[in-house]
C-alpha cells in the first residue's frame, strides 16, 4: 500500500509515468465494475472508456491522508461515472433538478 501511495503522490506532482502506471494497475478494477453493467445494452469497451474517466478522476482527487485503500476510494467514482453516462445517454432525458 505504501508503494501505491508513493505512486499517487508522484502522479499528483505531475509525473505522467506514475499516472500511467496507476491506470495500468487498476484496469482490472475498471473491468470488474464494467461487468456489473453488462446487461444494459452498451458495448463493454464503451463502458470501460467511461469507467476509465472515473478512474482518472479518482487518481486526481485521492488524498493520501485518507486512511483507505485507493481502490476503495476509486470504486464509487468509477460506478458514478458509468451511471451518469447511462442516465444521460438514455432515450428519456430526466432533469436532475427539481
Show which residues each predicted segment covers:
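Alpha-helical promoter-recognition and RNA polymerase-docking modules of transcription initiation factors
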Residues: 1-92
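Short, intrinsically disordered, charge-balanced linker/junction segments flanking boundaries
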Residues: 93-98
Amino acid at each position: 500500500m505504501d508503494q501505491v501511495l508513493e505512486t499517487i503522490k508522484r502522479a499528483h506532482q505531475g509525473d505522467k509515468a506514475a499516472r500511467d502506471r496507476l491506470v495500468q494497475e487498476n484496469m482490472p478494477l475498471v473491468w470488474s465494475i464494467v461487468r456489473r453493467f453488462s446487461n444494459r445494452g452498451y458495448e463493454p469497451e464503451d463502458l470501460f472508456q467511461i469507467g476509465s474517466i472515473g478512474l482518472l478522476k479518482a487518481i486526481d482527487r485521492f488524498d493520501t491522508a485518507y486512511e483507505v485503500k485507493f481502490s476503495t476510494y476509486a470504486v464509487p467514482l468509477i460506478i458514478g461515472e458509468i451511471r451518469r453516462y447511462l442516465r444521460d445517454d438514455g432515450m428519456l432525458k430526466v432533469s436532475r433538478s427539481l
